[in-house]
């Protein structure tokens, strides 16, 4: 079992890992550790997976790279660039519906501030209608708090969809690139000119981040920050920018191998290993109140009691409530 998993991992890394030079270092590490008997006393399959994950990350510093053990045999890898099987499509549809395509909460807060919590950027037919529904509810709010504190990633195309809603239809904004090693190609992501829901252009956006924000969640935050389209509030994010997928390396083992890397068109780099640094640093727990306070204060300057008495009272009450929050 150990030899199969180690050799399978080495072969997968050689063939697919986005950084070939690091793949060579990982091969040396695994062979040296195996020769030294580092894995001989491990009897639990899960413990072996955990140890291999720790060893691989100690050199790669790639948080996406993880070994997993499955009680059921791992299916064979599909051919490169093969479309998803019917079973995979059904699984993705089921997950999207169970998780509401990642849309956890959409709300109009007192003071006419919009709030959207997104925990995943899932792919599938359910995403577009839910995004349109969310943006329809938020359309008449005056500022948006986009909560990515528990966002663990997903499809970069869905990130591009959400970012597109924050720009006018005529805007042609280059959001992100992803280089893919197996095909030696780069895929570009731009804002979309046609969307099914109302846009949220030219209004303030505040993005909440935490140390748990990862992968696609980080991309969204990084994209909006580098484009100067949003103010980031919260904690430094997890630091995972290399895209990929699971590869079978043993009968019951799969290794997530990052095959691509994000290349931001503005910075020409990404957030791998360092995370996305917020514009306003605070704890994850305080991020919402901090953003809400900023949005309300901006509203207070813009809205007068004479022009909008009901909204003005809402703003004042919300500010008083926040001032009493410990």
Show which residues each predicted segment covers.
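Extended, small/polar residue-biased N-terminal targeting/export presequences
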Residues: 20-111, 305-326
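STAS-typified acidic loop motif
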Residues: 100-128, 266-267
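Terminal peptide-recognition signature
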Residues: 9, 56, 116, 146, ...
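Gly/Ser/Thr-rich loop/hinge elements
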Residues: 153-204, 208, 212, 242-248, ...
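A short, well-ordered alpha-helical element
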Residues: 124-142
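Mature N-terminal segment immediately following signal peptide/propeptide cleavage
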Residues: 1-28
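Low-complexity, Gly/Ser/Thr/Pro-rich intrinsically disordered linker/tail segments
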Residues: 269-326
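Short acidic catalytic loops
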Residues: 116-117, 140-152, 208
């Amino acid at each position: 079992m150990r030899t199969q998993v180690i050799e399978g991992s080495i072969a997968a890394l050689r063939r697919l890992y986005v950084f070939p030079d690091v793949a060579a270092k990982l091969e040396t590490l695994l062979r040296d550790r195996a020769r030294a008997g580092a894995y001989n006393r491990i009897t639990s399959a899960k413990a072996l997976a955990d140890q291999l994950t720790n060893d691989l990350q100690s050199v790669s510093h790639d948080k996406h790279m993880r070994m997993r053990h499955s009680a059921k045999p791992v299916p064979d890898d599909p051919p490169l660039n093969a479309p998803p099987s019917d079973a995979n499509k059904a699984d993705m549809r089921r997950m999207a519906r169970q998780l509401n395509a990642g849309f956890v909460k959409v709300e109009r807060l007192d003071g006419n501030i919009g709030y959207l919590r997104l925990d995943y950027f899932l792919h599938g037919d359910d995403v577009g209608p839910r995004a349109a529904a969310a943006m329809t509810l938020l359309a008449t709010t005056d500022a948006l708090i986009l909560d990515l504190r528990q966002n663990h990633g997903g499809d970069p195309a869905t990130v591009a969809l959400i970012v597109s809603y924050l720009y006018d239809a005529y805007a042609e904004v280059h959001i992100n690139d992803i280089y893919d090693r197996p095909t030696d190609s780069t895929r570009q992501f731009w804002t979309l000119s046609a969307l099914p829901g109302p846009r949220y252009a030219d209004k303030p956006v505040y993005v909440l981040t935490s140390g748990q924000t990862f992968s696609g969640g980080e991309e969204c935050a990084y994209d909006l920050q580098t484009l100067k389209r949003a103010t980031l509030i919260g904690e430094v994010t997890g630091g995972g920018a290399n895209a990929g997928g699971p590869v079978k390396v043993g009968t019951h083992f799969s290794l997530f191998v990052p095959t691509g890397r994000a290349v931001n068109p503005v910075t020409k780099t990404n957030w791998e290993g360092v995370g996305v640094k917020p514009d306003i640093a605070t704890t994850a727990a305080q991020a919402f109140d901090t953003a809400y306070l900023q949005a309300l204060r901006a509203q207070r300057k813009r809205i007068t009691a004479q022009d909008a008495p009901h909204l003005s009272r809402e703003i004042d009450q919300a500010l008083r409530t926040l001032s009493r929050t410990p």
